[in-house]
Amino acid sequence: MARENRDTQPNDGMQEKLIHINRVSKVVKGGRQFGFAALMVVGDGDGKVGFGRGKAKEVPAGIQKATDQARRWMTSIPLMRGGTIPYPVEGRHGAARVMLRPAPEGSGVIAGGAMRAVCEAVGLRNVVAKSLGSNNPINVVRATFDAFDKLISPQAIAMKRGKSLKEIRGQGGHDE
């Protein structure tokens, strides 16, 4: 049944990336009952991304639940020309800490594990990322989203300060 739902889903240009599947077991009188938990990231490749967790007795059903949740909880981040972020940022969740830094054109996505999948889904093409502390995939993804939440577009910063975009980027407007 879950397979039919996945095939009939419209192709809306979203990239779906499976990050982690965890098999869990519950010991009962008659033996073990197995279940599965899936962690998915969904992004449009142009600044919108979301993640979701799904639990079910079968893997495909858990993946479908995680994908549906990721599509519901999308967030957007400001992307710069060249597919990078505007400035270095750090995110935390629990013991997981991630650092994201902008990279020059042609660098590619230099990131490992769960962070690489998130960066590719959101559309980052040139970024350097480092995971510190915990390497639990769920906490690393949450820390990455925490870092994304701290990003503010240069246009929003300029508007907030009452300056032009050129002054914010350091391309003139200095009196010295």
Curated annotation (Swiss-Prot):
Q: Report the GO molecular function annotations.
A: rRNA binding; structural constituent of ribosome
Give the signal peptide, or none: none
Keywords from UniProt, A to Z, are: Ribonucleoprotein, Ribosomal protein, RNA-binding, rRNA-binding
Q: Where is the S5 DRBM domain?
A: 14-77
Recorded hits in PROSITE patterns, A to Z, give: S5_DSRBD
What's a Pfam family this protein contains? Ribosomal_S5_C
- InterPro entries this protein is in? Ribosomal_Su5_D2-typ_SF, Ribosomal_uS5, Ribosomal_uS5_bac-type, Ribosomal_uS5_C, Ribosomal_uS5_N, Ribsml_uS5_D2-typ_fold_subgr
Q: Which GO terms describe its cellular component?
A: small ribosomal subunit
Record bears the keyword Ligase: no
- Name its GO BP terms in alphabetical order: translation
Describe its assembly. Part of the 30S ribosomal subunit. Contacts proteins S4 and S8.
The record ties this protein, via PANTHER family, to:
MITOCHONDRIAL RIBOSOMAL PROTEIN S5 (PTHR48277:SF1)
| Domain description | The N-terminal domain interacts with the head of the 30S subunit; the C-terminal domain interacts with the body and contacts protein S4. The interaction surface between S4 and S5 is involved in control of translational fidelity.
What role does this protein play? With S4 and S12 plays an important role in translational accuracy.
Record's family?
Answer: Belongs to the universal ribosomal protein uS5 family.
List the protein's name: Small ribosomal subunit protein uS5
